[in-house]
Amino acid sequence: MDETPIFFNMYPNKTIAKKGNKTILIKTQSQEKCRISVILCITADGEKLPPFLIFKAKEEGYIEKNLSELNLVKNKKCYITCNLNAWSTEKIILRWYKNIWRKYLESSESLCEGFGYLIMDKAPSHITEESLAIMKNDKNLISFIPAGLTRFIQPLDVSINKPFKDALKKEYINYCINMNEENLKITREKMIEFVCKVWYDENIITKR
């Protein structure tokens, strides 16, 4: 399991200009600093569990309630929540655990027979006493990746996050080209659609 930020503005970092130009104007969006966090998780046999999206908004406010009515959310293709900084907290990690990881262990798709082995980094929201107690009580063995080593031995950091974000960026750029609008803003609903489409695409990462 890992969390990764995703920005609403995913423009390419290159442009085309005449050789010798001293000034090059590049248009950007007003959303260039807007982001969400996504909690991703894959199993040892390549099963992709539903992504958990964290938006920047009031917790349990009208934005969260409206997003919860989307078909992708109601059909449990993904889960969403909100808080004021779009980062995970102990409460959010426990929601992820209860709605995604625990349900996977209890499902017929799981090969774990009720036991779980969870690998994650040592982010503050991952190592609270309450969350660890609940996870261990459910017969989970938990391994923490030491700080500074996630890019070497964290499976998602090493193999998944980059192709996922590259595919997400490609989806975003194609959408912007097809829309052909200046100052196009990506809605929260569209971001959910992007994330789910890319995550469940069997040609991008692992199997589904």
Which residue ranges define each predicted feature?
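RecA-like helicase/translocase P-loop NTPase motor core
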Residues: 1-208
